[in-house]
A protein has these predicted regions:
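Flexible, low-complexity linker and terminal segments
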Residues: 2-31, 161-241
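Glycine-rich phosphate/diphosphate-binding loops that line cofactor/substrate pockets in enzymes
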Residues: 8, 31-43, 90-95, 177-179
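Gly-rich Lys/Arg/Thr-decorated short loops/hinges at beta-loop-alpha junctions or inter-strand turns
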Residues: 8-22, 38-43, 62-71, 98, ...
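Metallocofactor- and cofactor-centric catalytic cores in central/energy metabolism, strongly enriched
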Residues: 14-63, 69-83
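Proline-rich low-complexity regions
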Residues: 50-53, 156, 184, 230
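Thiamine diphosphate
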Residues: 52-179, 190
Length: 243
């Protein structure tokens, strides 16, 4: 607050839009369409570190905590990008869908250690990394692209056209691709993609089968093959070649 005025943006209208169901028309920003698409995909947990142009994804979910609790979606504003990336470790042993977000390229550099381990081991549940790609836009310090990081770690990189229907479909397909290939997927969003206005036909949100309100019955058995450590890493590296 500043001189008694609350300077925080309210996402009350956007939160109501997240509740739209089958056949309803969603109208709003690209980044909020991504948020809606996550819920339609049955995401179980979302984490991240705020940074332009993807900040609103986490902001609206934090303000929608009551609705997230109702769906069973765990939302966490992380201390940095590395701790956000580490959250995706939940999808290594369990068939749960998770998404994390931050600004690239500096944020991706911070998360690189966790991302390398995640990409080596692979995932069971769909894992989506939503990148605020700001190359050439003028609000980033470092002018580098995320492509090199995705290439070195064998992470799929999706670059949706700035159209809300395409963006939403890309989120859905990214989870399917991640689960089919057992590999995390990056989706890069530029500033125009995040803030363009548009509309799409919504679908019902899906409550995750495993969530904060519907916890797993048994702990996953210990599997040394799912640890990024020799000799497991040799087999993991070989499996990446055959994706």
């Amino acid at each position: 607050k500043l001189y008694g005025i609350n300077m925080e943006r309210s996402f009350k209208k956007e939160i109501e839009a997240l509740k739209l169901g089958d056949g309803d028309i969603f109208e709003g920003e690209g980044i909020l369409a991504v948020t809606k698409a996550l819920l339609q995909s049955g995401v179980a947990y979302v984490g991240g570190y705020q940074g332009s142009p993807v900040s609103n994804l986490l902001d609206v979910m934090v303000q929608a905590k009551d609705y997230m609790k109702e769906l069973g979606v765990h939302v966490e504003a992380c201390a940095n990008e590395s701790s956000a990336a580490a959250m995706l470790g939940a999808s290594i042993n369990y068939p749960v869908r998770g998404a994390v977000t931050w600004k690239s390229i500096v944020g991706t550099n911070v998360a690189s250690d966790a991302l390398s381990h995640l990409a080596s081991v692979g995932v069971l549940g769909g894992s989506l990394i939503i990148i605020g790609e700001d190359y050439g836009e003028g609000s980033s310090i470092i002018q580098e692209r995320t492509h090199g990081v995705a290439l070195k770690s064998t992470i799929w990189l999706m670059d949706p056209r700035p159209n809300l229907e395409v963006i939403v479909r890309t989120v859905h397909k990214a989870f399917e691709l991640s689960e089919y290939s057992h590999t995390p997927v990056m989706m890069q969003l530029r500033i125009r993609t995040c803030h363009l206005q548009g509309k799409f036909i919504a679908k019902n949100n899906i409550k995750p089968k495993i969530s904060s309100t519907n916890k797993v019955g048994e702990v996953a058995p210990h599997n040394y093959d799912l640890i990024a450590h020799p000799p497991s890493t040799y087999a993991q590296e070989l499996s990446l070649i055959h994706i």
